[in-house]
Swiss-Prot record:
Lineage of origin: Eukaryota, Metazoa, Ecdysozoa, Arthropoda, Hexapoda
Composition-biased stretches (Basic and acidic residues): 20-37
Protein's GO biological process: cell differentiation; female sex differentiation; mRNA processing
Protein's name according to its UniProt entry: Female-specific protein transformer
InterPro entries membership: Tra
Feature: compositional bias, Basic residues: 56-69, 77-92, 102-119
Keywords noted in UniProt: Differentiation, Nucleus, Sexual differentiation
Entry domain remark: RS domain directs localization of proteins to the speckled subnuclear compartment and the purpose of this localization is to allow colocalization and co-concentration of components of the splicing and splicing regulatory machinery to permit relatively high rates and/or efficiencies of reaction and interaction.
Length: 199
């Protein structure tokens, strides 16, 4: 065996396990599901504090007050709420809003992911198909009367069997007989009487 491990001598019969075929985690469904499931556990210890509540500006309010003595809290009827009250209210409002919002968002995404399943749901509805057991030209050709030996040959030639219904775009091609049918003389023909006289 050379130092070059890629070239192996025919004598080298050591069994080596075939290298497992590598597949990215996002292509393997189970691994990807476990990875997504474990993602929240890998979060760093330092957490981002929620964004402080932004001040709400009404549409009709001036973009910024001209004087420093007037703050947005005072603009409503020149009455200043106590700061502790404002802080208390804003904290509770932010908490309730964020918790309900996150809950709503989580439930919506959960329901959306439930709708996306791995195998598409195929809804089968039993639809009655009329006359499914009958072939395309079921009644054709119409039944012919059975042979009755009591009656002799007809005085007129039989018409050919009626043709099958044909809805082709072009004219029906002529029938091609792969093998000639048996020779049947005219039903009124008699070998004894109607034989051609030899000349």
């Amino acid at each position: 065996m050379d130092a070059d491990s890629s070239s192996r001598s025919p004598r080298d019969t050591r069994r080596r396990s075939r290298q497992r075929e590598k597949m990215p985690y996002f292509a393997d469904e189970v691994r990807e599901r476990d990875r997504v499931r474990n993602l929240p556990k890998l979060k760093t210890t330092q957490k981002r504090t929620p964004t402080p509540p932004r001040e709400r500006r009404s549409r009709h309010e001036r973009p910024r007050s001209r004087s420093r003595t007037h703050s947005p809290e005072q603009s409503r009827c020149q009455r200043r709420l106590s700061r502790s009250y404002v802080r208390h209210r804003s904290g509770s409002r932010q908490k309730t809003y964020s918790s309900s919002c996150s809950r709503r968002r989580r439930s919506r995404s959960r329901s959306r992911s439930r709708g996306r399943s791995r195998t598409p749901r195929i809804i089968t509805v039993p639809v009655p198909v009329p006359a499914a057991e009958y072939s395309y030209a079921y009644g054709w050709p119409p039944p012919r009367p059975h042979f009755n030996p009591m009656y002799g040959a007809l005085p007129f030639g039989m018409q050919p069997r009626p043709l099958n219904p044909y809805f082709g775009a072009y004219a029906r091609p002529p029938p091609f007989r792969y093998r000639a049918g048996p020779f049947r003389p005219h039903p009124r023909y008699s070998y004894r009487n109607d034989r051609q006289a030899p000349n």
